[in-house]
Amino acid sequence: MSVASVALSPALEELVNFPGIIGRFGFNLDDPILVFLTIAGSVIPKRVMESDSIASVKLRIQSIKGFFVKKQKLLYDGREVSRNDSQIRDYGLADGKLLHLVIRLSDLQAISVRTVDGKEFELVVERSRNVGYVKQQIASKEKELGIPRDHELTLDGEELDDQRLITDLCQNGDNVIHLLISKSAKVRAKPVGKDFEVFIEDVNHKHNVDGRRGKNISSEAKPKEFFVEPFIVNPEIKLPILLKELISSTLEGLEKGNGPIRSSDGSGGAYFMQDPSGHKYVSVFKPIDEEPMAVNNPHGQPVSVDGEGLKKGTQVGEGAIREVAAYILDYPMTGPRTFPHDQTGFAGVPPTTMVKCLHKDFNHPNGYSFSPENTKIGSLQMFVSNVGSCEDMGYRVFPVDQVHKISVLDIRLANADRHAGNILVSRDGKDGQMVLTPIDHGYCFPNKFEDCTFEWLYWPQAKEPYSSETLEYIKSLDPEKDIELLRFHGWEIPPSCTRVLRISTMLLKKGSAKGLTPFTIGSIMCRETLKEESVIEQIIHDAEAIVPTETTEDEFISTVSAIMDNRLDQYAWN
């Protein structure tokens, strides 16, 4: 998956403000907003009107240089501009303001490969893959070329390192990358007494090189250059076998030389961790210091000024623990998991845990060395094989029960970032049934409801009533036990976030008990427009207006409950 980071550097901001630059690009001072996009190394000015909708701006970006844009994120003033039906002015954009954007381009890249003897063939690979993967594909396609590690790939005369990402090679705007493959020189040693003689062989001829006295350095143990290990706050916690195996398989891949592959999708640093063969992904690692608007974010986003994340009510650097918390609270029908059990949760959140990890291929803007200060702490989530995400296909084919299980999770956790792109689609191996897997839960558990968004709200499945099994699961939920469970795992969830969790769970339980559909319950939680408060926000404000400031949390929640009952009765009668 490829992302073009569209962010303004300080140098570019000076360029925009430099006298005469406006006229040079053919714009007048009367133009309300100028947006400068950097895509594939080019700076492209675009005019944006205050009355333009967010959707129209995204459509305009799609036409730039013929790029096929699958997904875009627009950022302004540290906040994601996410509501397509809102206007530019709704987000406070005015004359002279600058937008930061992240867009996702087509996942696939065409590669033309030519051998030294003139043979040519083509490959199509994901942009998130690296050069080493391309070598493996070449070897499987052209058997006579031999072992992948014995070859060199060059681009414009430059030898490419195996860990180089394909997306990094797409800098000249060409639709096809042209590579040259040749056999690399082989080095072998022949013992001669206490010395050894070194031979270097290439495709056409051999050379003798003077040897040196000493041991063969290849037999010496290499110094440790990486590690992956659990990050556990509470020593009473014992990792289940599934999570231990997840960490172990991730480490085995690194030991075989298969380094992390940074995903070019999304606005934070996320790394695909490979298995020992290098052919499959086993996990996804998200360091806290590379989250959106964090200090080491690899996409060049501005650092958060007040600590708030892209979504209102979230904090930069807390995305990883929220990812883990979503897995912990997504327990099965039988209730919270107990050691050593590791059953799949009701909504199917992939197994996730906190780890410490060190590797040179993570983002180290100040340079890398094998030292404690370069250790990354973040979430490690099991990779789920899939055939795409929900944004890649029509939503009418999704099973009702699969959509409903995700709605339960999102309403309960007050998810501020549920879109079709973070719901994976796969097929059950037994009967081929479609399975939806929710991922990316770094914006759950906010301290306010302002940015709650559920894309499934507009799918027809959301207007179907919950099944008896789902209602039974919802009935069993207990926010107080959930809060204690999170604390046991080391997250001292802030009081403002626990309040939201209590109220969101209350809404889910009360609404479903009255026969309300996911659509109705979700509509109560989400805003219809950017500036119009949701029903749940109105209920909270009504409660705040009634109770005195020194009221206990239990008394406040009781007041919210009474007001909510009255509101929900109106929905039930309709």
Swiss-Prot record:
Residues 263-269 are annotated as: G-loop. Keywords: ATP-binding, Kinase, Nucleotide-binding, Repeat, Transferase. ATP binds at residues 264-270, 286, 381-384, 440. SUPFAM superfamilies: Protein kinase-like (PK-like), Ubiquitin-like. It is an enzyme of class 2 (transferase). One of its GO terms (cellular component) is nucleus. The phosphorylation of phosphatidylinositol (PI) to PI4P is the first committed step in the generation of phosphatidylinositol 4,5-bisphosphate (PIP2), a precursor of the second messenger inositol 1,4,5-trisphosphate (InsP3). Belongs to the PI3/PI4-kinase family. Type II PI4K subfamily. This is Phosphatidylinositol 4-kinase gamma 3. It comes from Arabidopsis thaliana.
